[in-house]
UniProtKB/Swiss-Prot annotation:
Keywords: ATP-binding, NAD, Nucleotide-binding, Nucleotidyltransferase, Pyridine nucleotide biosynthesis, Transferase. It comes from the Bacteria. It catalyses: nicotinate beta-D-ribonucleotide + ATP + H(+) = deamido-NAD(+) + diphosphate. One of its GO terms (biological process) is NAD biosynthetic process. Residues 182-201 are annotated as: Disordered. Catalyzes the reversible adenylation of nicotinate mononucleotide (NaMN) to nicotinic acid adenine dinucleotide (NaAD). Belongs to the NadD family. Its EC number is 2.7.7.18. This is Probable nicotinate-nucleotide adenylyltransferase. Gene3D superfamilies: HUPs.
Amino acid sequence: MARRELLTPGLKVGLLGGSFNPAHEGHLHVTRMCLRALGLDRVWWLVSPQNPLKSDAGMASFDRRLASAEKMARDPRICVSDIEARLGTRYTVDTLAALTSRFPQIRFVWLMGADNLIQLPHWARWRDIVQTVPIAVYPRPGFTLKARLSPAATALRDVTLDATDAALLPLLTAPALAFLDGPESSQSATSIRERGGWSLR
């Protein structure tokens, strides 16, 4: 992950965390949307060893999920990272604290789906998360309007950008939020597993 170009001062990097169980075209779709809308230089896919809000039942091994992400990352601007496993961080708030400390010269943006913004108050120390890096929210089918009315969005109303100003987000100091406009992807890891399109081994 720590290639020389990734450490260029001022580089704008989106962080997309997830189980990637498996990685799929939807991940690629939202990544390219965020790259374009936010003017990012890179997006790091942070493959989680174990999402604390998800059961490990039906979860493939970390190495298999990492390999799935590497296979799907068909864009040179995407960097698949195992840094959460190497850091031993369990919660997003700790991962972000470690990354911003290790790479203070990089302008990080946390990328999350509208469905996850709704759940954000259930995340560990979520108010510390929003104070650490700006957050970009990409649309998800059935959740986009609910996300705009969610408690987290309400708490961040005064620091929310218009979608037309989203490219400014990486330049801002947290807290800052932007909802991105764009086509929604209906693909999900759950539906792929339910169709039998993903083996746990």
